[in-house]
Amino acid sequence: MARLHERGLLHRLADGYYVVVPQDMTGSSWMPGLETAAAGIASAIYGPDNILVMGVSAARLHGAIPRALATATVAVPAQHRPIALSDRAAVVRFVKRNTQGLDAERYDTELGSTLVTTPEQTILDLAHRPDLGDAEVDVPTAVAALYERSDKDRLQALATEQRRIASLRRAETWARQ
């Protein structure tokens, strides 16, 4: 592995976690986006169908938070300690959740597809725990942007199923501001 890393064929994300550098980027200072890196690490630990990019990280992938963040959040079936990345000042936080019970969609990244919470699920997650992911200043604006393009019936159904009516009301308040 060390030899492949030295030759620029592998990129080291964190201790024990590497990704293959895309062929057209070999030899450059390429590194994947934080959300992509987090999905890759979580997939290596739990398998690709058992993890979901969520919270502020999902909002970033949905285009609702434009600035880069230093924390990525991933829903996983069992708790795991946070992993500090070695290629940048960032951390991947794992949130134990029933990943099969979350509303998700496939999202294509530079390293392949991953599961990401839908805009509706992301709204509920952000409104429920706005401080998760260390970007609480961005959350109301992100929720408002996602709310504008969300399916309101689906949002109401998810809030009811997941007992997140209070979170939905908070999101609606942010969307009206």
Specify the residue positions occupied by each region the protein language model found.
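Hydrophobic/aromatic-lined pockets within catalytic cores
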Residues: 9, 63, 128-131
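A conserved hydrophobic position in a structured secondary element of the catalytic/binding core
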Residues: 13, 53-54, 118
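Residue-level detector of family-conserved "landmark" positions at structurally sensitive sites
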Residues: 14-15, 69, 137
